[in-house]
Each structure stands twice: as C-alpha cells, then as structure tokens.
C-alpha cells in the first residue's frame, strides 16, 4: 500500500497530491476555528484580569502571570487537583485489576467460559449511559430516603446512612460510577490486545507445562504492555476531565466541603461566573498536564506502529 | 501425563470456572442493579416510591409519563427533540468528514501528509475543556450562543473517529480500487462518495453510533452554550432537576425522566451490542 516503492508510481501520485489537501481541508479548517483559535484566545485571556462584579465588568487589564500566582496561592487549586487525583485512583485501580482478570478469563483457551457474550454485553453497557443521568440516578438511589437506605433500614439499621454528607462515601460513589462506566471498555481493549498475540506463544508455554497464572504473568502481561500504557494514560487524561458525575451528584458544589470538587468543575465555575482570567489560567494548567501525558502516549503509539507497520 | 494428574487438572479447572462465574455474576449485579431500580421506579408513583423499595414494577408508567410531559417547568418534549437533532447531525457530519480526512491521508501522497497525521494524533488527547473558554467567547461574538451549530460543526474535526477510519481503510481499502476508478474516469470526490463510502459502511455505522451516543450524553458544552429554555438538551434538564428544590419533586417523574435519557440508548445497545463491542476492539491499537 505504500506508494514510495516505484518511481513511476510516485510521479503519478504527485499529480493527485492536491486532492489530499482538499480531502483533509475540512478537518483542519474546523479544527482551526473551533479548537485552535479558542485555545489561543484562552491562553491570551489567562494573562488578563477580567471578571464581573454584579453587572459591572472589571478589566480586561493585563496582569501577566498574576492569575497563575493567585491560583496557586489563594485558591484551592491544589486541593482540587488532589481531589481529582484521589477519585481517579479510587476508580482506576480496581478498574484495571478487574479488567485484566476478565480479559484473561474471556481469552483463556482452557477455561472456555459459557455465556461470555452475555457478560461482555452487560459489562460494556454502563459505558454508553449518560453520565448526567447516571449520577442523577445514583443521587436518588443513595439519597437519605432512597432505595439503598430503605433496604439498609429494613435490614435493621437505625438511621439512614448519609452517603453524600461523608467525604469517603461521596468520593467512593464517584469512583464506583467511574469504575462501572469504564471497566467494560478497558476489558474489551485488553481482550483485543491479548487476542492479537501470536497463539503459538501460548501453545509453546502450555507444552512447557506453564500454568494459566504463569502464562498470564510471563507471556501475556509483557506483550500487552503498550496497550496497558495506552489504557493507563487515556484513563488519566479522562480522569483529569472528570466533570459530569461529580457535578450532578454534588450539584456543582463538590460536597462535603468541596472535597469532591474536580479541576473541570472548578473551571466550569469560572466560566459560568465569567471570570475569564482565572478560567484561562486553570485551562492552561489543564492543557499543560494533558499535553505532557499526550506526548508520552504519542511516543508509545508511534513506537508501536513502526514495529507493527507492515501488518496491514 | 497420567490419568490421575489429568483428573486433578480437570477438577482444578472446574473449581476455577465456578469462581469465575460467581465473580462475573457479582459484577453483572453491580452493573445492572441501578438500572433495575431505575426501570422499576419509573413505573411506580410518588407515594409508592416513598413507601420503600420494591422488586416488582408498579402500574404508574403512563401516569408518570403524562405528568412529565405536561410539566410546565420541564420542557421534556422540546429537549428530547433538541437532543435527537443535535446527536443525529453530529453523527452524520462527524462520520462523513472523518472518513473524508482519513481517505485524504490514506489515498494520497502530499508534502505535509506525515505532519498532518502526526498533528491529528497530537490533538487527539487534548481535552476539549481546555479551549472551552475561548470557544464559548468566540461563539458568543459570532452570535452563535443558543444555536446548535457550535455543538454540531466541531465534530468535523473528530480525531478519534478519524483514527478509527484510517485503521479500517488500511485493512479494507486497497489503492488499486481507487486507481481502477480513475481509469474509468471517475472524479476523486465521486470515487469517495460512490466507492469508498460503501466499502466503509461497517466502520461508519459503528462510529455513527458512538458519536450519536457521545453527543446525546454531552453535558459540559451544551450547558455553557444553551440557556434559552426551548434550546435545552436532556442532560441540561437533568442537571436542572438536580439543582431544583429536590424534596418537592414527584419522584415518579424524576425516575421517568432519567429513564427517558438512558433507556433508548440501552435498547439500541442491546440490539447492536455485537457491532459495538467489536467496534471498540477494532478501534484499539492492535498488537
């Protein structure tokens, strides 16, 4: 499929090259208008003081890096950063462990689980659910007078457990929802990775008398490492973007006492109150964090493609 | 291996199998229990729900629906229509242009091809939220606040869909087909629309479903852009319900509204789950 091979082909494809530009033009135009210009203007805004007091607009005045300075000294930025990180870890660790286990089981040739199609269907389902509706549902289910408390009370608990008034249970509920929404997706990605491994490697290990856990640890895990990195970093970037679930569950306040307020919820607050200077500064920091992570993914990606490039 | 060892191996395998099933059933329960409560409670009336939890559905679904659709404070019908319109347009626009971009990079050689591909891969993982501030301001100055255009047109540049299409083309679209069309005198756009798109149908279908669902579920951007009540989408309505004085609400209506937002997606998913699950695996990086 590579046309660089023969010079004749190459010279012919040059005359069609302009079509390539035409075909990719809409993408780049849309990206320019809807992402790149907004991105630059967000950066630009982060250097200005500009906010509303009642109906009066303060600024815009150029303040240099002052927004960044006050972000780290006055606001609770570091608190929100650690909230985001803690909640992400709480959901991601069980997600990865369970997904690895399920992916190993579903692809195990000796185990041959029945109804695996049914289970795959079920575990992937929560991924397609509207996060806003899902968290609204959790809010009603875990409310003081909700079904979970009514079951707990009927089992002999004296007063309802106030899930959204405690730090641990609130963070736990958000993490549980993140877990439920993503473990199916991760399982299927890992399964695809495992099924991409040359079966003769497993056969060889089996003939050598390796047990299933041994095969998993010493053959499967090292070979799916690139996908594990991919899963890890896309999940981390997804975690940085965490918004809908905690926003709806805590009504945008990050209760109790802003311990479940995430970075994007904080950004959203600035955008709604039209505090564009501070909002810009938060955006730039978010951008920097994800840019570093994206670069890592990008390099692990391209490294992979060069190795598997001739497969197509 | 003698027969005794074989028997022992068989036995340990069945023990493992039982353990797997127990674990899977637990996970299934965990994944489904909230949806079960949702469906049950959507069919029960407010006083019934207040009385406590029940495992059996009630008879008030029609009653709840009627209350919900006539509720003056919740423009459910118009938000349902808005959500459907935006999601359908996003899916159409997004898949068509992503296939077009992928085709441009797959089928032609030009100077900035490598750069273009690398660039798209770079932007793939930059969250949309980081440019939200500039985006909302730009759309306001362009007079596009409260319009669906800023929710639909940005999907022309959907890097993840592009990447999926590109991978699919690599395995199903030989350049020879395009060359044959050229010899027959087909114009390049004609080739794309009449020959490439039909070949891409399975990939287009899977990605259209994903884009539809993602747009249907989107809350962050619509909430920032749409504030007039006849333009609201379903997620905004749900958020509005959450921030309203909750105790005064008819819980039957609350559950029914959440069900309206979720259940159609579940039904479509159950019908198409084979494609969807395959689609996720297809789009992933292959080893």
Where is each model-derived feature located?
Chain B
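N-terminal Lys/Arg-rich, disordered targeting/topogenic segments
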Residues: 1-6
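A structural signal for multi-pass alpha-helical bundles of membrane permease subunits
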Residues: 8, 12, 16-287
């Amino acid at each position: 499929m590579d046309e660089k091979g023969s010079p004749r082909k190459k010279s012919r494809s040059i005359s069609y090259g302009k079509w390539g530009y035409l075909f990719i033009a809409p993408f780049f135009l849309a990206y320019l208008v809807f992402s790149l210009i907004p991105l630059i203007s967000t950066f630009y805004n982060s250097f200005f003081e500009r906010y509303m007091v009642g109906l009066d607009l303060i600024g815009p005045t150029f303040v240099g890096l002052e927004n960044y300075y006050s972000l780290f000294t006055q606001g609770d930025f570091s608190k929100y950063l650690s909230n985001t990180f803690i909640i992400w870890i709480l959901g991601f660790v069980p997600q990865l462990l369970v997904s690895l286990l399920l992916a190993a089981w579903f692809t195990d040739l000796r185990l041959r689980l029945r109804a695996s199609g049914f289970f795959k269907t079920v575990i992937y389902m929560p991924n397609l659910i509207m996060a806003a509706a899902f968290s609204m549902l959790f809010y009603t289910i875990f409310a003081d007078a909700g079904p979970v408390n009514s079951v707990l009370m009927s089992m002999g608990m004296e007063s309802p457990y106030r899930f959204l008034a405690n730090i641990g249970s609130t963070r736990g509920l958000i993490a549980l929802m993140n877990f439920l929404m993503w473990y199916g997706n991760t399982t299927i990605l890992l399964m695809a990775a495992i099924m991409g491994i040359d079966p003769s490697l497993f056969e060889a290990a089996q003939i050598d008398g390796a047990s299933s856990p041994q095969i998993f640890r010493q053959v499967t895990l090292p070979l799916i490492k690139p996908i594990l990195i991919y899963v890890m970093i896309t999940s981390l970037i997804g975690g940085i973007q965490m918004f809908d679930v905690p926003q709806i569950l805590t009504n945008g306040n990050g209760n109790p006492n802003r311990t479940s307020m995430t970075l994007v919820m904080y950004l959203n607050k600035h955008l709604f109150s039209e505090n564009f200077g501070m909002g810009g500064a938060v955006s730039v920091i978010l951008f920097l964090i994800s840019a570093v992570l994206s670069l890592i993914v990008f390099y692990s990606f391209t490294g992979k493609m060069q190795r598997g490039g001739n497969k197509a | 291996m003698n027969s005794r060892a074989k028997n022992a191996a068989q036995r340990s395998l069945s023990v493992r199998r039982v353990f797997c099933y127990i674990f899977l059933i637990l996970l299934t329960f965990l994944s489904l229990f909230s949806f079960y409560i949702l469906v049950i409670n959507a069919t029960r009336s407010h006083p019934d729900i207040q009385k406590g939890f029940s495992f059996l559905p009630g008879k008030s679904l029609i009653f709840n629906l009627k209350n919900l659709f006539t509720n003056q404070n919740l423009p459910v019908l118009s938000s349902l229509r808005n959500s459907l319109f935006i999601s359908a347009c996003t899916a159409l626009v997004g898949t068509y242009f992503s296939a077009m971009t992928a085709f441009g990079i797959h089928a032609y050689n030009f100077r900035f091809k490598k750069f273009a591909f690398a660039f798209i891969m770079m932007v793939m993982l930059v969250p949309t939220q980081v440019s939200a501030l500039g985006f909302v301001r730009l759309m306001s100055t362009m007079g596009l606040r409260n319009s669906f255009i800023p929710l639909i047109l940005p999907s022309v540049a959907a890097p993840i869909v592009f990447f999926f299409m590109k991978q699919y083309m690599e395995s199903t679209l030989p350049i020879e087909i395009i060359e044959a069309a050229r010899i027959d005198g087909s114009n390049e756009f004609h080739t794309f629309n009449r020959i490439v798109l039909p070949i891409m149908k399975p990939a287009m279908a899977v990605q259209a479903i994903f884009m539809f669902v993602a747009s249907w579920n989107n809350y962050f951007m619509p909430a920032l852009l749409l504030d007039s009540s006849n333009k609201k989408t379903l997620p905004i309505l749900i958020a509005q319900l959450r921030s309203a004085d909750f105790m005064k609400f008819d819980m039957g209506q609350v559950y029914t509204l959440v069900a309206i937002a979720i259940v159609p997606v579940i039904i479509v998913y159950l019908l198409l789950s084979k494609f969807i699950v395959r689609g996720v695996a297809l789009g992933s990086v292959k080893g």
